[in-house]
């Protein structure tokens, strides 16, 4: 039997051709770092972004979302650059957002989510690690270990609760 369905398989050479466009609401492929303080698994490295740090380049945060993202706690994260591997994105986030060149990471864990009425798809890769102290970086107004059990969902940037829950760091409701 032959089908005219176009399955959501992304490949340069798929035969027959598969997906020719993205979902109406868009699709984001991102990497997230969930770094806990050594010996304190509930204390996670999060920050409030510095709006003047070029987040359109280092984290794929567009001008529209910059204000909203600056007001909440956010994990070090970014969309993947076209053809970048999830592991490559995690290493780039370490360098560009945290100024770290050598950090052990486990992962990735993967998660998928849809949001909004416009059928937006999110595919995320989560990398976990541990550190004894928070780095200092000009990308962040504030970068510190936060006890996530003390945070309310509305204090975090969009999807951070989901990422932390998938990583086993946030109690699910």
State where each predicted segment sits.
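N-terminal strand-loop-strand
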Residues: 2-74, 102-103
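Glycine-/small-residue-rich active-site loops that bind phosphorylated ligands and cofactors
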Residues: 27, 81-82, 151-152
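NUDIX/MutT-family hydrolases
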Residues: 71-73, 126-128, 134-171
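Short histidine-centered catalytic/ligand-binding loop motif
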Residues: 73-84
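Structural detector for helix-capping/boundary residues
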Residues: 78, 92, 96, 146-149
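Conserved acetyl-CoA-binding loop-helix of GNAT-fold acetyltransferases
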Residues: 85-91
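Active-site segment of metal-dependent pyrophosphate-handling enzymes
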Residues: 91, 95-133
């Amino acid at each position: 039997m032959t089908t005219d369905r176009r399955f959501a398989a992304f490949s340069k050479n798929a035969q027959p051709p598969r997906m020719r466009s993205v979902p109406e609401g868009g699709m984001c492929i991102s990497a997230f770092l969930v770094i806990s303080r050594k010996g304190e698994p509930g204390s996670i490295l999060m920050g409030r972004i510095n709006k003047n740090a070029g987040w359109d380049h280092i984290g794929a945060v567009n001008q529209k979302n910059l204000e909203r993202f600056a007001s909440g706690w956010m994990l070090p994260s970014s969309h993947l650059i076209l053809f970048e591997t999830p592991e490559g994105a995690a290493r780039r986030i370490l360098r560009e957002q945290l100024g770290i060149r050598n950090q052990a990471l486990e992962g990735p864990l993967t998660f998928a989510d849809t949001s909004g009425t416009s059928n937006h798809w999110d595919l995320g890769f989560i990398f976990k690690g541990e550190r004894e102290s928070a780095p200092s970086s000009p990308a962040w107004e504030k970068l510190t270990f936060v006890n996530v059990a003390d945070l309310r969902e509305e204090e975090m940037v969009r999807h951070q609760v989901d990422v932390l829950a998938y990583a086993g760091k946030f109690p699910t409701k």
